[in-house]
Amino acid sequence: MGFPIALMIDYVWKSPKPPPGTKRRALDRTHPDNFKYFRNWGFTIYRTYYGPESDESWNTLLQVLTQQTRLALGYHDTDRLRAKDWRWANFYKGDKATYPDLINIMKRLFRLFPREDPDRLAGLDVAGIRKLCLEEGEQAESEKNMVGTRLKFVLVADEAVLKDIANDIFVVKTVGYDWDPIQDSRSWGWMRLATGDLLEFWEMILMADEYSISKYYDIFFKGSEEDLEKHVWWGSASLSRFGDCSRVQTACKDDKFGRFRFDP
């Protein structure tokens, strides 16, 4: 299953503090007038390759990541997951009408924050991105735009990524910039993932933060760092695979075990 939608809403909800000595008033989080109290969630994405014709691949990558992540949120819109969302059952009193609203709020709040600068970013490898993020205060800078910066992951579009996009191979690199090679020795601190799996990855690191476990556990890799350049993330052991919800597929009436169904 995925990370509960109602807990995601808690994560991005930042209601104003009441005046001293007064009790905080509960606000309807699904009311349009209160949308201003939500903060965006997403990733900073660094572009490190500026070769010929790479602009088109870069723009395609940004569009695909945004569209697929929002589509993947549709995985949560099922009776089964709603029934398991204890936070929704308690806080929203089991009001079924609110559940699709919460999913749509998460869709609207997703953002990518691109960083482009050929003079400073061109040719940087993973280690260079980590160094840049630490030296230039990536966490504090990103906090101005979105929640979740304490998760300390960014996306990277390097030469390999953008050339893959040009060949209809849709992957992106995700880099943890607080990775410790001794403490987190089971992984290299970065991973290539299919663009449709970005939501699953975000839910994985959010869950790790929520339960105080290593966010690098689910991106472990036994091979060399060179071999990792050919590997694509297989997903989290703690979550169901739902990246397929972001892909065009054909539903089959006779498929009893498929994810998609025809409406009656």
Question: What role is predicted for each listed range?
Answer:
Residues 176-264:
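Acidic, proline/glycine-rich low-complexity IDRs
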Residues 1-194:
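Extended, charge-biased low-complexity segments
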